[in-house]
């Protein structure tokens, strides 16, 4: 306290002593003269008119942003000379959605605790004000790792090639119960349908992390991200690799069709990539040999397969080849001759002029084909022969479609041989000749008798020479 060091008494023996101070509290004032003194206490009080925020200190920081755990500050209110002011109402504000009592009242020491809660992680500015005096401090709320959950799982890259290298990607975001992002959190990851993924990933400062997923299997893969008891799943799609398209299978599904140019043998071609994933919409080149007819290209369906239809007018084996890129497979199909159109294609005399002895045979060869000239084996051909000749009534064709017809006769001359199948017929003539080996005088007849015996007029006779079966023999010398 401040006062004049001496005072002089007035006529009545008294004098006023004036004491001032800038320090609130009790001040002891002592008056002395000679060896006599007395003391009294005087009190100075803080000046509420100059109340101000003297300090604002953070006492508790980095509390969890759960709306319950509080960061705390201590505000001190003094007058202009630093004297603590009790019972002063301090206005308080907090930003970024934090919660705080709008006013607090100072304790006897001029201070008061301010509690701030928030559900939003981050920095909060707290401002304490009285009169026109204010101070601000920042406090930090942190996300609550105890309530970590999968907030989002979003596909950021889809439809990657199923080559085991190209990746589909997803972004997972981890937050606490109030949506505050959580960095450094370990997220467990699984992927279905044979896809490959890291078993765990760690979130970045923004609470997110990329998840790359690869696969060698085309189709849908369910990717699941989990933390604590929280999980989310999203589907990603892998597509077959058209760059590695190949012929995986070529299978005969129908064989032994008739070679009539319309009934088809069929094959099924399957196109996959290197890892066996079926490829739809792929153009496969097709060839067929031995005169068969096939569309030059076919296009695979959704299951990666396509039907190949092959027709032919030529019986036999046809090699069918399917190709894509540098991949090729071939399969044989068989066309068979059409027995419904069996016909006598040829009837050829291969031995003629046999002796009419009932044993020596003239020979013919019949050839049976279908309408397109394909040889028909195992076909029954009906045979007839004229002029008394003898032949088997039916013959059966060999694998080459031909059969030999043997004809014998005891009657010399021409015999017409006819071969018939269905409504088709051909005829050829063969000749049998009399057997000179068995020449004989068949008859000797007098044709002129009783002629005059004048050495000129003649009696005549006719001799007839035949073989053993009575066939006349010309050019025979008769003694």
Tell where the protein language model's regions lie, with residue ranges.
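Thr-biased low-complexity repeat/linker tracts and other Thr-enriched repetitive architectures
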Residues: 1-479
């Amino acid at each position: 306290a401040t006062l004049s060091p001496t005072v002089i008494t007035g006529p009545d023996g008294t004098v006023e002593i004036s004491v001032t101070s800038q320090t609130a509290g009790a001040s002891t004032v002592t008056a002395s003269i000679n060896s006599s003194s007395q003391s009294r206490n005087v009190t100075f009080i803080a000046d509420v008119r100059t109340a101000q925020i003297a300090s604002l200190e953070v006492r508790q920081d980095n509390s969890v942003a759960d709306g319950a755990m509080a960061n705390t500050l201590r505000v001190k209110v003094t007058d202009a000379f630093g004297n603590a002011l009790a019972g002063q109402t301090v206005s308080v504000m907090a930003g970024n959605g934090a919660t705080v009592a709008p006013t607090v009242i100072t304790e006897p020491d001029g201070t008061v605790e301010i509690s701030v809660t928030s559900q939003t992680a981050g920095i909060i500015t707290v401002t304490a004000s009285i009169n026109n005096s204010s101070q601000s401090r920042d406090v930090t709320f942190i996300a609550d790792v105890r309530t970590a959950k999968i907030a989002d799982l979003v596909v950021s890259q889809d439809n990657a090639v199923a080559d085991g290298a190209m990746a589909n990607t997803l972004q997972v975001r981890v937050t606490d119960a109030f949506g505050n992002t959580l960095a450094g959190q370990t997220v467990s990851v699984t992927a279905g349908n044979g896809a490959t993924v890291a078993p765990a990933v760690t979130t970045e400062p923004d609470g997110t992390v990329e998840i790359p997923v690869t696969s060698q299997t085309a189709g849908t893969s369910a990717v699941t991200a989990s933390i604590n008891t929280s999980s989310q799943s999203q589907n990603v799609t892998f597509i077959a690799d058209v760059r590695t398209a190949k012929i995986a299978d070529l299978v005969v599904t129908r064989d032994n069709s008739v070679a009539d140019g319309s009934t088809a043998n069929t094959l099924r071609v399957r196109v996959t990539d290197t890892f066996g994933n079926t490829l739809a919409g792929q153009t496969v080149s097709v060839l067929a040999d031995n005169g068969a007819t096939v569309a030059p290209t076919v296009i695979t369906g959704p299951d990666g397969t396509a039907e190949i239809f092959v027709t032919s007018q030529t019986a036999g084996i046809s090699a069918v080849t399917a190709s894509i890129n540098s991949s090729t497979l071939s399969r044989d199909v068989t066309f068979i001759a059409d027995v419904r159109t069996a016909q006598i294609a040829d009837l050829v005399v291969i031995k003629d002029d046999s002796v009419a002895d009932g044993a020596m045979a003239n020979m013919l060869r019949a050839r049976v084909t279908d309408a397109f000239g394909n040889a028909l084996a195992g076909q029954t051909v009906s045979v007839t022969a004229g002029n008394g000749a003898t032949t088997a009534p039916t013959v059966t064709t060999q694998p080459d479609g031909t059969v030999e017809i043997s004809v014998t006769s005891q009657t010399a001359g021409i015999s017409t041989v006819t071969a018939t199948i269905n409504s088709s017929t051909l005829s050829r003539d063969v000749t049998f000749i009399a057997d000179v080996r068995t020449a004989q005088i068949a008859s000797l007849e007098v044709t002129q008798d009783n002629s005059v015996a004048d050495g000129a007029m003649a009696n005549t006779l006719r001799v007839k020479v035949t073989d053993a079966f009575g066939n006349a023999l010309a050019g025979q010398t008769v003694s």
